[in-house]
Amino acid sequence: MNQTPLNTEKFQRKAVKVEEAQSRIASYAQQGEREDVGLEQAHGRYLAMDLTAPHPYPRFRRSGMDGYAILASDTEVCSTGQEIWLHVIDEIPCGTVSDKRVETGMAVRIMTGAQLPEGADTVVMLEATQLREENGQTYVGLKKRMEVGKNVTQIGHEIKEGQLLLSKGTCVGAGHVSVLATFGVHRVPVYKKPRVAVFSTGSELLAVDEPLQPGKIRNSNTYMLASQIREAGGEPFILQAIHDDLNLARASVREAIAAYDIVVTSGGVSVGDFDIMGDLVRQKDVNMLFNKVTMRPGSVTTAAVIDGKLLFALSGNPGACFVGCELFVRPTIQMMLSSAHPYLQTWTAKLGADYTKVNNYTRFVRSSLEIRSGQVYAIPARVDESSAMVTIKDSDCLIVVPPTTEGLHEGEEVHVLVLQGGQVM
């Protein structure tokens, strides 16, 4: 009886290190296009150009407190304990400008933030003065010697004209919005959000609103990935899950590549008979970047280029899928947005509990963070198998465990990759 020869190509995978995999991806990450959005829509977006100050800030000398604008030279005699009286010639509420000039023997009542009148060079606080009325005129008395510029914010104290305000690639937050508004930037140049197609493969998958059936599971990875993509600054588009059919997968991927900037799939990347994505990336018209990484979980994580666009084929195991997205998809989106720091931040922490697993590959262990006596500790998840789903929600970071034959002990110093939204409790 003749038998079809076993195709062993899918078993012959050359593993690359995480850093090498990231480097290969980075060479294909294309910078996004620019669009202008209203200031109220700019939060969370990434600036597409450097922004410089069109004017100094503040633009005028302003009072730092409620008091009186005076000439510091008038107070020189106060060093001997002598009290002086100055004629109050005007009052300046915030938002108005006086047309009076302060000269020797004069003072102007001024409010916090108001523009100093011409001639004045210092402000004495209200609490250090007293008033008297004489022949219908108001006089202010003080006994304290004042220095030039006291309680006065000078022109350009915070920002000089032409100074860099915000750098290209900055993720706009509340403080940045305040700066933009202050300088009248009502239309903000940002990068368009990368459009990312997401779908899962597997005949065992059910829609989230379908009742459970024997041997079936709900399609949770797609929604998890969509959230991760959104957090990274992308715009996810959830496509319909497909069955384990290579031709169907090829057509779905081609259609997605044509319509979106990035394509991310979950499932079908191992070496089984129904692992269709593993077969798809070996097609002649696909530029496979790698199909094995020296990491756990997610060693079968795969990346390829089709028609100049990146395809990420992630593991169907939730833990491995999550880690693969954080290490490879997130940085790609961030690079398309010109983020200065596309990769997860690395911290040093103490290991909060023994970790006994031995590893021939670098392991990224889901963990929580907490403070003990002023020291940051990373506590490994109790269940961290690649198939485990529930512990993802409790993860603040990924402990980076290098290849080891002995495991790690509580109290050892470890490196951790801090996840977006990770909190130290």
Set out the residue ranges of the language-model regions.
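Structural signal for hydrophobic packing residues in well-ordered secondary-structure cores
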Residues: A26-E33, D50, A72, L116, ...
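Flexible glycine/proline-rich
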Residues: E35-E40, G44, M49, G95, ...
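Thr-Gly-centered strand-to-loop micro-motif
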Residues: I110-T112, L126, S167-K168, V208, ...
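Short, glycine/charged-enriched hinge/interface segments at domain edges or termini
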Residues: N2-V18, A69-Q240, A378, R382-V383, ...
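Conserved active-site and cofactor/substrate-binding residues in soluble primary-metabolism enzymes
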Residues: R13-E20, R34-V37, Q41, M65, ...
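Helix-rich terminal scaffold detector
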Residues: M1-P5, F11-V18, H186-L314, P318-G324
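Short, low-complexity N-terminal leaders and the immediately following helix N-cap/first helix
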Residues: M1-T80, R109, S339-F364
